[in-house]
């Protein structure tokens, strides 16, 4: 009997994502707030004027400033299909997908809360309690076990891709680096985030990955949450690899009374060699949660803390009066009719 709790979820390999035209799809959304920007593009909070709910729209540039392709449309479509296939309470749902000549758009479930990265940045000590870490490990364990059982590796598990809502629910997002299994296995990786990738994922040219790459990354996230810093963060892949080979500092050297069983689970999952790690997310979470903390109390604590941190933050919501036909841009609002 696995120690982490189970939820009913559905795998839908034939979820339709028929590329509703950008004019038809985006016309219904009113921009409210820019949630994040970066090399991936931007994420905007928008109001769905039809269903009267908030959604998050990820806008991904297809052409960079030099006029060269920035993101292949097939890569974006692959991300949309992968996330849409996995319908699970701990995975952020993709609602729709479209593109025009300049951008691709993923319309996603809006999670009202914050990322684990923001949570750790703002909470006292920049770390989790044992109970909070147990709740996060339990939720991510369920999400990843479900994904793996349906032939999907995430390959970009990090605090920025873990969302916590006001009820203490934890959801995994961003399947942009995901790999789907085939008759020959998962093959190699297409990248990831330095500090959370194991050696086989860092080796983009010849390395091959499987479920144990996600085991490694999940262990990095839980280690960071408990100890206050990621064990293998570095400026370059080579430096990160050196840190991995050198081994992580034992948590008990950083935190008094660290549970021995949880420490053993983390150190095993952080092994440089895949064969030395647990063979599955389920096996890792069973060992980790056996001695870490209370999942139920952790969820209650996350709910309370996210509420308190959100109350301290002044919410900025852009006025949308007169912008019903608008779509976000980096510099404000562009009328939908101007998009070719």
Residue ranges and their predicted role:
Residues 61-85:
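AlphaC helix of the eukaryotic protein kinase fold
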């Amino acid at each position: 009997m696995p120690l982490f709790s189970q939820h009913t979820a559905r795998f839908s390999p034939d979820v339709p994502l028929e590329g509703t035209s950008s004019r038809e799809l985006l016309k219904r959304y009113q921009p409210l707030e820019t949630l994040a920007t970066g090399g991936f593009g931007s994420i905007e909070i928008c109001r769905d004027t039809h269903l009267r709910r908030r959604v998050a729209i990820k806008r991904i540039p297809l052409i960079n400033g030099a006029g060269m392709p920035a993101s292949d449309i097939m890569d974006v479509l692959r991300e949309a299909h992968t996330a849409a296939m996995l319908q699970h309470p701990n995975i952020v749902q993709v609602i729709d997908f479209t593109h025009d000549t300049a951008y691709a758009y993923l319309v996603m479930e809006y999670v009202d809360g914050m990322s684990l990265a923001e949570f750790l940045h703002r909470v006292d000590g920049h770390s989790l309690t044992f109970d909070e870490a147990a709740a996060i490990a339990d939720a991510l364990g369920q999400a990843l076990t479900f994904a793996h059982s349906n032939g999907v590796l995430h390959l970009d598990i990090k605090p920025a891709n873990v969302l916590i809502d006001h009820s203490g629910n934890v959801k995994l997002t961003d399947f942009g680096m995901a790999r789907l299994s085939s008759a020959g296995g998962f093959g190699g990786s297409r990248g990831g985030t330095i500090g959370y990738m194991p050696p086989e994922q860092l080796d983009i040219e010849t390395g091959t990955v499987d479920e144990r790459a996600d085991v490694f990354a999940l262990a990095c996230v839980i280690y960071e949450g408990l100890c206050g810093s990621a064990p293998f963060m570095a400026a370059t892949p080579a430096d990160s690899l050196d840190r991995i080979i050198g081994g992580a500092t034992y948590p008990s050297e950083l935190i008094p009374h660290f549970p021995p069983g949880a420490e053993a689970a983390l150190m095993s999952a952080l092994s440089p060699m895949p064969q030395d790690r647990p063979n599955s997310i389920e096996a890792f979470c069973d060992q980790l949660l056996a001695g870490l903390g209370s999942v139920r109390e952790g969820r209650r604590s996350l709910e309370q803390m996210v509420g308190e941190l959100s109350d301290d933050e002044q919410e900025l919501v852009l006025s949308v009066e007169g912008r019903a036909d608008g779509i976000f841009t980096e510099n404000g609002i562009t009328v939908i009719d101007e998009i070719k």
